[in-house]
């Protein structure tokens, strides 16, 4: 019941032709393509930012661990 068949797609295409006319359909398709590309670029930027944050957190955690080990080694040498 919720599936799209070839008939549904053709019916939608005819409705778009009636509403927008054959001259505006290429412009509409081009605009939709640009919008989809922009959306995908935005998602990629979010992924890159999230990865950068994750990498920075790992480096910070590693630095804290190495500082703790350095302090322990210094205490052991002083004893």
From Swiss-Prot:
Residue ranges crossing the lipid bilayer per the database entry: 1-21
Q: Which GO terms describe its cellular component?
A: TAT protein transport complex
Give the main location: membrane
- Where does the record place the region Disordered? 52-79
Topology in membrane = Single-pass membrane protein
The Swiss-Prot or TrEMBL record annotates one GO molecular function as: protein transmembrane transporter activity
Q: Where in the cell is it found?
A: Cell inner membrane
User: InterPro entries given for it?
Assistant: TatA/B/E, TatA/E
Q: Composition bias, kind Polar residues: at what positions?
A: 56-79
| Keywords, in A-Z order | Cell inner membrane, Cell membrane, Membrane, Protein transport, Translocation, Transmembrane, Transmembrane helix, Transport
Q: Which GO terms describe its biological process?
A: protein transport by the Tat complex
Instruction: Report the family membership.
Output: Belongs to the TatA/E family.
Which NCBIfam families has this protein been placed in?
A: tatAE
**How is the subunit organization of this protein annotated in UniProt?**
The Tat system comprises two distinct complexes: a TatABC complex, containing multiple copies of TatA, TatB and TatC subunits, and a separate TatA complex, containing only TatA subunits. Substrates initially bind to the TatABC complex, which probably triggers association of the separate TatA complex to form the active translocon.
Function as written in the Swiss-Prot or TrEMBL entry: Part of the twin-arginine translocation (Tat) system that transports large folded proteins containing a characteristic twin-arginine motif in their signal peptide across membranes. TatA could form the protein-conducting channel of the Tat system.
* Protein name (record): Sec-independent protein translocase protein TatA
Q: Supply the source organism for this entry.
A: Bdellovibrio bacteriovorus (strain ATCC 15356 / DSM 50701 / NCIMB 9529 / HD100)
- Please state the gene responsible for encoding this protein: tatA
């Amino acid at each position: 019941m919720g599936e799209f068949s070839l008939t549904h797609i053709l019916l939608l295409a005819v409705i778009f032709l009636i509403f927008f006319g054959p001259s505006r359909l290429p412009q509409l398709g081009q605009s939709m393509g640009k919008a989809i590309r922009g959306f995908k670029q935005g998602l990629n930027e979010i992924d890159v930012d999230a990865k950068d944050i994750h990498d920075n957190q790992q480096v910070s955690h590693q630095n804290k661990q190495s500082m703790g080990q350095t302090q322990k080694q210094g205490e052991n040498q002083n004893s």
